[in-house]
C-alpha cells in the first residue's frame, strides 16, 4: 500500500530545525521527496499560502529544514490551516517579512531527503517516493520504461514513466487497475497500460492550431 509522508502534526508552531532534533540541511546529492509547494502571499505581514503533500497537512512542519526548489534552505516558523481547504496552510518563514518577500516564494517546492522519512510501519507499505527509479514491466516481465516521478495534480497519484529506449514520458494512474503489482525489493512495478500509453500526440483536429 502506498502512503505519503506522515508525522504527528505540530500545534500552532512548526518548530522547524528544533522539532527535527537539529536535522542538517539537505545535501546536494540527497534523493529528495517533495513535501509541499508555496502559493501566493497571504496578507501584508509576510505570511504565505502552502500546499502540503503530507498525509496530515500540518505534519510538514515537523521535518526540520526544507530545501526549496531555488536552492535555499527554508525554516517554517509557524503554520495554521487556511480556511476552506484542508491541505492548504498559511505559513510564516524565517527571514521573510512583508508581502513582497512572501510573493518571492510563490511556486517554490519544498523537499527533504528520502532517508529522513524512515521506513513505513508495515512491511507491505511503501512511500510513493520509493517508486521513483523502479522499472515498469508488463505482465510477462518485459521492461517498458522507468518511473521518473509520482505527481498528483488533485485527482490521485500518477506514475510518470519514461519509455524504454527514450521518448516522451507518459502518465499512468496509480491504481490497481493499471498497476496490479508493486515489488519494491525487486525494483519493479507491473503495469497494465493502455495500448497507446507511449504513442506520440496526434495532430490537432482540422481547423485548430
Curated annotation (Swiss-Prot):
Pfam families: PRC_RimM, RimM. It comes from the Bacteria. An accessory protein needed during the final step in the assembly of 30S ribosomal subunit, possibly for assembly of the head region. Essential for efficient processing of 16S rRNA. May be needed both before and after RbfA during the maturation of 16S rRNA. It has affinity for free ribosomal 30S subunits but not for 70S ribosomes. HAMAP family: Ribosome_mat_RimM. Gene3D superfamilies: PRC-barrel domain, RimM. InterPro entries: PRC_barrel-like_sf (IPR011033), PRC_RimM (IPR056792), RimM (IPR011961), RimM_N (IPR002676), RimM_N_sf (IPR036976), Transl_B-barrel_sf (IPR009000). Its main location: cytoplasm. One of its GO terms (cellular component) is cytoplasm. GO terms for molecular function: ribosome binding. GO terms for biological process: ribosomal small subunit biogenesis; rRNA processing. Binds ribosomal protein uS19. This is Ribosome maturation factor RimM. It is found in: Cytoplasm. Residues 123-197 form the PRC barrel domain. Belongs to the RimM family. The PRC barrel domain binds ribosomal protein uS19. Residues 1-28 are annotated as: Disordered. The keyword Glycoprotein does not apply. The gene is rimM. Keywords: Chaperone, Cytoplasm, Ribosome biogenesis, rRNA processing.
Amino acid at each position: 500500500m502506498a502512503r505519503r509522508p506522515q508525522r504527528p502534526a505540530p500545534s500552532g508552531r512548526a518548530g522547524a530545525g528544533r522539532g527535527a532534533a537539529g536535522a542538517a540541511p539537505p545535501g546536494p546529492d540527497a534523493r529528495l521527496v517533495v513535501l509541499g509547494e508555496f502559493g501566493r502571499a497571504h496578507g501584508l505581514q509576510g505570511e504565505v499560502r502552502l500546499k502540503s503533500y503530507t498525509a496530515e497537512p500540518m505534519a510538514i512542519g515537523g521535518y526540520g529544514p526544507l530545501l526549496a526548489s531555488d536552492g535555499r534552505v527554508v525554516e517554517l516558523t509557524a503554520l495554521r490551516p487556511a480556511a476552506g481547504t484542508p491541505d492548504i496552510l498559511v505559513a510564516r518563514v524565517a527571514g521573510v517579512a512583508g508581502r513582497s518577500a512572501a510573493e518571492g516564494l510563490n511556486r517554490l517546492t519544498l523537499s527533504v531527503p528520502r532517508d529522513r522519512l524512515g521506513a513505513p510501519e508495515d512491511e507491505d507499505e511503501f512511500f510513493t517516493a520509493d517508486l521513483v527509479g523502479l522499472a515498469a514491466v508488463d505482465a510477462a516481465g518485459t521492461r517498458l520504461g522507468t518511473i521518473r516521478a509520482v505527481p498528483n495534480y488533485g485527482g490521485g497519484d500518477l506514475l510518470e514513466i519514461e519509455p524504454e529506449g527514450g521518448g516522451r514520458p507518459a502518465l499512468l494512474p496509480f491504481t490497481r487497475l493499471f498497476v496490479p503489482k508493486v515489488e519494491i525489493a525487486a525494483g519493479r512495478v507491473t503495469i497494465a497500460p493502455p495500448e497507446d500509453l507511449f504513442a506520440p500526440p496526434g495532430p490537432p483536429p482540422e481547423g485548430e492550431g
